[in-house]
Amino acid sequence: MRRSRGLLLIPFAVLIATGLVVRGQQASPLVLLGVGLPAVDEGPIPDETHRPFSPEAIRRAAIHAADDPVRRGRGGRAFTAGRVIVKFKDAASEGARDAAVRSVVASGVRQPRTASADFDVVTIDPAADGEAVAAAFRARPEVDYAQAPYRVHATLVPNDPLYRSSPSFSPGQWNLQMLNLESAWDIQPQAGSAITVAVVDTGLAYMNTTLDVTIGAFVDELGTSHPALGHQLIPYSAATQIVGAGHASRIVAPHDFVWNTNTPLDFDGHGTHVSGTVGQLTNDGIGTAGVAFNVKLMPVKVLASDWDVAFGGSPFVGGTDDMVARGIRYAADNGANIINLSLGSAGPPNCGTQPNQDGCSPVIESAIRYAVGKRCFVVIAAGNDAEVTDPDFGLNPTSVIAEIASRVPGAVSVAAVDRRALGQTGARRCTGDPNLPDCHAYYSSFGPYVELSAPGGSDRSFGRDGYVWQQTFDFTYTDTFDPAITPTYGPPRFDILAYVGYIGTSMAAPHVSGVAAMLMQQGITDPAAIEAALEKLGIDLGPPGRDDKYGFGLVDARAVLRGLGLAR
């Protein structure tokens, strides 16, 4: 997919809003005209709602609106210059915190604490070494941890036009069959109706509106420059298979940390696809199915897309650790039962034993522990770097966010299997034997931190029949800046949806989130107990017992629910 071509570590949207001058140009806000629910097939919606950005959004934009120089740190991870993340000890007074900042970097400014954060952001000279400044803060007695704002990205496999082609839908949802979901739905027909799943990602196509935007000149994530297109009215529609007639109430506490609004619209398609796997409407006679099709969905946008950049909401594509941490904490504080993180970043392999080294993500680990402490089950994609050789970390680098799960009971990291695992049961295992093939997806990162496996798909053995399919935007109308998709650059359309095939551990993680929602619906609400059940009752793939490719095995929805004594 374009969204992760090259799997660059690209950071979070920091808002540029009304009235700000950036690089000598006045940025324009995103205005939503005619906002409404439910989905597009429910008829026209009166043009009556305008939502310009708030003064708080503009204030934050002023903090972050500088050019976004990217640095590759000594620890190997890319980070954004000009700021550091600092967690002061609770006992430290405000005066002591300000004194610590002055001591470490005379020109540093501790910014006002933002919502959903227990840490501070200190702005520094963009020319300063952010990792060196963070190390100096870590040496202070008032500080719990400090780090550079390392970059993260969606865990989707690199670009191939075929990944997103959808003129027909011949393969069926082999991925749901693999999890024994038909039997699981018989056991738990409510399929998570009392459970809220937060998808911390690129947003969600959950409303009908018109985007009133000015498209400026921008550089996409591959480094290609595109000219300004000026003022545009762009149609936007809800994914009818996620928010259909009578289902608007399933969207709970949406929030956008890119634009700092409560309307986290997806301009990429990744977050919508992931949300569909978790909870796409089922038993409605059309389209595809989701795992826990009655769940409530909480879209939390923390990753910017190319169009977020073009619309003036972010100077870059992707996200940073501090924004992911805020998204996790927001979800935990606003009623999420399960948090899905289909995102990641390669980094050091030993953050568990050496958490203060450059390249680790203590701010995200703190947020995950906070969420689990509030009885949220956290699911993290294991990463897509099995065949990647990182210049600092070598072949198959560790996904530092997924690695956190291995030391937090109640959080799990999820590797991907491909369609070859379909039908594997009991003693039959995926091995190197050609009659019992290795069904680990070729791209799926592996290591001691992998705990579970789920369908992520693959194009190598099955072509398009090996993808994971859900409803999301038709890329033909959204990726208008990509000459491999459309020959002429122009404004996008977000009102045309299709059944689209993706592959990646981004796709594997939401299968586990959906099964966990069904377990919670059944009464297992302790995150550590959910993890234990999923691991104990999974289908053992590979060598007997836990291994670095499959973890404890393939999630088996029927076996997990039957483990509660419900025999169907």
Where are these regions (language model features)?
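Extracellular S/T/G-rich loop segment that most often corresponds to the catalytic His/Ser-adjacent loop
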Residues: 376, 402-518
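C-terminal subdomain of the subtilisin-like protease fold in secreted/lumenal serine endopeptidases
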Residues: 329, 334-342, 410-413, 498, ...
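A cross-family glycoside hydrolase active-site/sugar-binding cleft signature
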Residues: 149, 301, 340-344, 381-382, ...
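Acidic glycine-/aspartate-rich tracts in secreted/extracellular proteins
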Residues: 90-93, 152, 202-206, 210, ...
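Primarily auto-inhibitory N-terminal propeptides
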Residues: 20-167, 185-187
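Active-site core segment of subtilase-fold serine proteases
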Residues: 160-319, 323-360, 369, 388-390, ...
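Active-site glycine-centered loops adjacent to acidic/histidine catalytic or metal-binding residues
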Residues: 201, 383, 504
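Bacterial N-terminal signal peptides
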Residues: 10-18
